[in-house]
């Protein structure tokens, strides 16, 4: 099944200072969901409660803190992260960042 996507669709969250762009619109029906995440200075994602699945991210620019439960890990430009989503989790960035983020199964 081949899909050609011509543009991303997005959503901006003023409260959390982030913007999510769906790289594959309506990917919720697929096995995985890739998004382009822009964290503004001091931005973060809404904390996500534990759920089944796995998440992967690749930092395109800047630095992010990956918060998993009561632990925190740093990932900078060119680095990636991968985790089981069984812990409460979110990303944050002090100075802003861009991330390619993939969730399986879809959760955005």
Question: Where in this protein do the model-derived segments appear?
Answer:
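Short C-terminal boundary/hinge segments that cap the last helix of small helical domains
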Residues: 1-3
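A short glycine-rich, His/Asp/Glu-containing loop-to-beta-strand
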Residues: 8-43, 47, 102-103, 107
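Ligand-binding loop in jelly-roll beta-barrel domains
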Residues: 16-18, 76, 85-108
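Short, conserved beta-strand element in jelly-roll/cupin
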Residues: 38-39, 50-66
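Short histidine-centered beta-strand/loop micro-motifs
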Residues: 45-51, 91-93
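A generic structural motif
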Residues: 54, 61-63, 70, 86-88, ...
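Short acidic-glycine-tyrosine-enriched beta hairpin
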Residues: 69-85
